[in-house]
Structures are given as C-alpha cells and as structure tokens.
Amino acid sequence: MRLVVIAIGRLKQGPERELADRYRGRFDDIGRKLGFRGFDVHEIPESRARDAKQRIREEAAAILALAPEGAVLVALDEKGKNIDSAAFADHLGRWRDESVTSTVFAVGGADGLSPELRRKARLSVAFGAATWPHQIVRVMLLEQIYRAATILAGHPYHRG
C-alpha cells in the first residue's frame, strides 16, 4: 500500500520541515519491510478566493484531483475521532492487509476541509479538541504514521 499525504500550504525550511523529513525518512526505512510501497507528500498552494466557502471547495477539488483512484481517504479534521496510536496502526495494517492500493491523508488549510471531502473520507481523525496550525498537524501526522509502522513491526519506539 502506498501512503499519500496531501496538504494545503507549504512547509517552509525550518524546524517543522526538518521534523517532517525525519519522520518520513524513518518510515521509509521500516515501511518497506512491512509491505508499504511508498510515501508521497504533495503540497497544494492555498486558494486565493476571497470567500471562505469557495476556498474550501477549491482546495477540496485540488486534494481529490491528486488522490489516486480507489484510495482510502483519511481526513485530518478537528471534528474527527480522537483515536489512539494503536487504533491508528490497526487501520493502516488492516487496509494494507486488505490490499488497499493507496491511503490518502488530507490536511486542510486555515479554513479546514469541505463537507464533501469529509463525507468521502472513510476515517476522520482529530489530534485532540484543540485547533492546530497545519504545519504542526503535518508533523504530528507523519510522526503517527511512523509510530504506526513501529507498532505493526513490534519495534520498541511505541511503549504504550
């Protein structure tokens, strides 16, 4: 299974980019051994539309255009479920074992994700009740993907 993160906005050079790259690299090392075929990250520029609803629609269309056909869609959304790392790993492991070809993680911009995109998501995940900057959400997501791989591999990184 291929993992794809599609995020609105760009991570500039700095500590967030360094952490994101570190977790992605760590995943690459362990992910291949677990049957994951790759890990792509796509950054989409924020919409310039003046109206928030229009921005959300344009950003959702851009996310869906990059999502491979038949992919499982996971929305990172403040209204999503709070799941623990083991449950997150269970989802990834199950989809891999079901021969899902791709899992797409959608990270919205400042205005969030469109209702249409949220409806299409098989899973909607929140990292707590707080609202997080998209740069931090991206780092947290990449860490959780790496942590999920270590859980699936029985690696001691996750001690929960």
Curated annotation (Swiss-Prot):
The keyword Glycoprotein does not apply. S-adenosyl-L-methionine binds at L76, G108. Belongs to the RNA methyltransferase RlmH family. This is Ribosomal RNA large subunit methyltransferase H. It is found in: Cytoplasm. Its EC number is 2.1.1.177. The keyword Cytoplasm applies. Homodimer. GO terms for cellular component: cytoplasm. The gene is rlmH. Coiled coil: none annotated. Disulfide bonds: none annotated. It comes from Nitrobacter hamburgensis (strain DSM 10229 / NCIMB 13809 / X14). Pfam families: SPOUT_MTase (PF02590). Specifically methylates the pseudouridine at position 1915 (m3Psi1915) in 23S rRNA. One of its GO terms (molecular function) is rRNA (pseudouridine-N3-)-methyltransferase activity. Keywords: Cytoplasm, Methyltransferase, rRNA processing, S-adenosyl-L-methionine, Transferase. It catalyses: pseudouridine(1915) in 23S rRNA + S-adenosyl-L-methionine = N(3)-methylpseudouridine(1915) in 23S rRNA + S-adenosyl-L-homocysteine + H(+). Its main location: cytoplasm. It is an enzyme of class 2 (transferase). InterPro entries: Alpha/beta_knot_MTases, RlmH-like, tRNA_m1G_MTases_N.
